[in-house]
Amino acid sequence: MEQIKTFILMTFLALIFMFFGGLIGGEQGVIIAFVVALGMNFFSYFFSDKLVLKHYHAVKVDENSAGGLYAIVRRLANAANVPMPSVYIIPEQIPNAFATGRNPNNAAVAVTEGLLNLLSENEIEGVLAHEMSHVRHYDILIGSVAAVFAGAIAILANFAKFGAVFGGNENNRQNGILMIVAAIIMPIAAAIIQMAISRSREYKADAGAANLTKHPEWLISALSKLENYAQNRTMQNATPQSAHMFIINPFSGVKSSFSQLFRTHPSTKDRIARLNEIKQSM
């Protein structure tokens, strides 16, 4: 079922890419966008995880270099009945975490140094249980594919702005308004896609974490600390295109009506409320 969802997502994003390619370059733009979309689908499926990990300078660790962290991930992988994922630490002092990969057999979980310094061992386990739930539910591929396409859509939007401003011939000038509209709409379309993908899967992963650890309060405490920290600081190298992958939106501290309207995560208050309901039912 999750593979079907991923296929639908990749097809939908390719169609959006082709539509805006047509607005910018007519029939030739559609053809170019189609070829690029095919290449991006292939690239996203096999390499999106590596791209995201490289962007955040994630360092792979093992049981010798990070024994405690590795042991927690191994324990959760066994509980979730999934293969042991690769484990990475991001040299970043803002606490956060994400999972990536195309399937449970090729998964990776990454945490920042700041998260390891801020949270207790139980809270770290709650966060990692959340990420392992993403792995088990195949959310990781969908999130990685969406991140790559959102980045490409942002690039296409910049091309549209360039074409609208610097188009030299009469036809380009006549299409200038369409290009400007495309440049405005494309990032919004990318944000809506990320929002639709992320909000429901975060609730699902929170519930999965509670089920894996049998201690919802671990994740409740972790989310509260992470949210409080994120309100005052923003991650270095964080991009809006990959924000939906993190357990807490790295741009939580950015206060604007636009960012609130298109936020990629449900509110931490609502997530904690749902976890408290799960706790009471245990």
Swiss-Prot record:
Binds 1 zinc ion per subunit. The chain crosses the membrane at residues 6-26, 28-48, 140-160, 177-197. GO terms for cellular component: plasma membrane. Zn(2+) binds at H130, H134, E202. Its EC number is 3.4.24.-. The keyword Nucleotide-binding does not apply. The active site is at E131. It is a multi-pass membrane protein. It is an enzyme of class 3 (hydrolase). One of its GO terms (molecular function) is zinc ion binding. It is found in: Cell inner membrane. GO terms for biological process: proteolysis. Keywords: Cell inner membrane, Cell membrane, Hydrolase, Membrane, Metal-binding, Metalloprotease, Protease, Transmembrane, Transmembrane helix, Zinc. NCBIfam families: PRK03001.1. Belongs to the peptidase M48B family. HAMAP family: Pept_M48_protease_HtpX. This is Protease HtpX homolog. It comes from Campylobacter hominis (strain ATCC BAA-381 / DSM 21671 / CCUG 45161 / LMG 19568 / NCTC 13146 / CH001A).
